[in-house]
Design a protein with these regions (language model features):
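Glycine-centered coil/turn sites that cap beta-strands in beta-rich domains
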Residues: 425-458, 476-479
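Glycine-centered tight-turn motifs at strand-turn-strand junctions
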Residues: 466-489, 500-504
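Short, conserved beta-strand segments of beta-strand-rich sandwich/propeller modules, principally
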Residues: 401-403, 490-495
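A short acidic/small-residue loop/turn micro-motif
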Residues: 395, 472-476, 513
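Surface-exposed loops/turns
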Residues: 389, 440, 453, 485, ...
Length: 515
């Protein structure tokens, strides 16, 4: 009941006359300390009238407001955007949560007052996107109350049954299930509208809010009424992909509108529930949970039994289309192989600047795989790393810094990767090394950034002797500061000579070592 009291002994009770929602209470250094869910850490003391009073300002850490990490993406301006409410079969009834990390500072979108304005509970925000034409303008999808609109993090509108074509599956305005928000290249906002209740169901499962404010409703019988149309994406060809994650009606849907949004007569569309793999085996995936496209145009899909890859997604509409399950050799002399992560439920897949795959599992932590998926570069778990939990819910990678944000069931962590998005060309001001100079007490790696894909790197001393060489991972290269004999290099100036894979373009920079 948002109250706090203190027993001095079995017969004496002191009540705190403040409305605090506390989750932790202790005594230290002459203060009673209350950990409050919304107000941070607060110090309290008894006054002269033996009444407990708040005596310190609220201490709120620079951190996420809640440990809800079901959806994450990186905005165009480099900020991290998080939506805190997902669906696991059905809605979770989590308080509406949208958080942003900008310049190492956390902030949250408005929550208070939304219920009073809409007449509906504000909860289960499962997806949020930034308007590509206005960085202060956002839309957020909910698992039951439709679509919310924000400006400068403040609520401005709700779209539901009564003011838009959004549909409910059962006649109630708390069953308007929206998800999968994505903008296309023409700044039209796409979304899924899913749900069914016994015989009723949503008839038009894809909705589009055009840049001019006009709505379009698209009807495709193969996905109409499905319960959980969740993650979506546009591929390099402009096709729209949707996954259905509900275990009873899971599958993957692909749509090619031929560029005519308001004329569906020429559309190509197809829904596949159970894929056939390269061996002709029909797979039972036990659910489909995430989808992404890699640098080569292959589509990686996370299922309940490992990842599958669509190496030729342009053939998706053909009758003989098949997926690929990666076979990892056992290397035990038997010539046998195992399907990649076939025993793991895959909740999240992200592709870094080096086309490597970060794969988040339900119970086994996160894997970093080589571009082809055959090599495990890292396998981080709660037991061998700072991961807070082995249940990975979401992954987002900052394209310019390579920082990998990992949302777990117990909170958010990040890992500084050695891969960034590659540049199209070498630009003198963008190619540099850091830290520079390298001071005596520094023992970490030196990073060269601003590179193109597969840059050939040679590091020499002033006399031209080769000290180290290698190839960039995406747009970045890291060096441990050691020579080819494994010894730390002495003081001096070292030249970094960079060339593209064809050897037709090059650039140089310098690193100063102080020992």
């Amino acid at each position: 009941d948002n109250s706090l009291g203190l027993f001095n002994n079995i017969n004496e009770f002191h009540s705190l006359n403040h409305n605090l929602n506390t989750s932790y209470f202790s005594y230290a250094n002459g203060f009673f300390w209350a950990g409050c869910k919304e107000n941070g850490l607060i110090g309290l003391k008894f006054d002269n009238n033996n009444v407990m009073q708040i005596t310190t300002p609220s201490i709120i850490p620079n951190s996420p407001k809640r440990n809800y990490n079901f959806y994450m993406n990186i905005e165009k301006n480099g900020n991290l955007l998080i939506a805190g409410g997902g669906m696991v079969g059905d809605r979770l009834n989590y308080v509406g949560t949208i958080m942003e990390l900008s310049n190492n500072t956390w902030s949250s979108f408005q929550e208070d007052g939304i219920k009073e304005q809409t007449g509906q509970s504000y909860k289960d925000i499962n997806c949020v996107v930034q308007d590509p034409t206005d960085p202060e303008h956002y839309f957020a999808a909910s698992a039951g109350e439709g679509l919310y609109e924000f400006n400068n993090k403040n609520f401005i509108n709700q779209y539901s049954l009564h003011n838009s074509p959004l549909e409910t599956a059962n006649g109630y305005d708390t069953f308007v299930r929206i998800n999968g928000l994505k903008y296309d290249n023409d700044n039209n906002l796409w979304m899924t509208n899913s749900g069914k209740d016994k015989t009723e169901g949503v008839l038009n499962p894809i909705k589009i809010l055009k840049s001019d404010g006009k709505w379009i409703s698209l009807r495709y019988p193969e996905i109409a009424g499905l319960n959980n149309l969740e993650r979506t994406m546009f591929d390099k060809r402009g096709n729209f992909w949707v996954i259905s994650s509900w275990i009873a009606d899971y599958g993957v849907f692909c749509l090619d509108t031929k560029g005519t949004l308001e004329d569906s007569s020429d559309d190509k569309h197809k829904f596949i529930k159970n894929f056939t793999n390269q061996d002709g085996t029909i797979l039972s995936h036990n659910g489909i949970y995430c989808i992404t496209e890699d640098k080569n145009g292959a589509i990686w899909i996370g299922t309940g039994q490992g990842p599958i890859i669509l190496n030729n997604p342009s053939n998706f509409f053909e009758d003989d289309f098949y997926c690929t399950q990666i076979k990892v050799p056992r290397d035990d002399g038997t010539n046998l192989a195992d399907f990649l992560l076939a025993n793991d439920k895959i909740n999240a897949i992200a592709v870094d600047g080096g086309n490597r795959k970060w794969i988040g599992t339900e119970m086994n932590g996160i894997y970093l795989l080589s571009p082809d998926g055959l090599e495990t570069i890292h396998h981080f778990t709660a037991e061998n790393s700072p991961l807070l939990s082995n249940n990975i819910q979401s992954i987002a990678i900052h394209p310019h810094t390579g920082e990998v944000f990992i949302g777990t069931s117990k909170g958010l962590v990040s890992y500084q990767s050695d891969a960034t998005e590659p540049e199209d060309n070498f630009v003198e001001d963008n190619v540099y090394a850091y830290p520079n100079p390298v001071k005596p007490d520094y023992t970490g790696v030196i990073t060269i950034t601003g590179l193109v894909q597969d840059t050939d790197i040679k590091i020499t001393n002033v006399s031209g002797k080769l000290i180290h060489e290698g190839t960039s991972v995406g747009g970045q290269f890291t060096w441990d500061g050691k020579n080819q004999q494994g010894k730390r290099v002495p003081s001096g100036v070292y030249f970094v000579l960079a060339a593209n894979a064809e050897g037709k373009e090059g650039i140089a920079t310098k690193i100063l070592f102080i020992r």
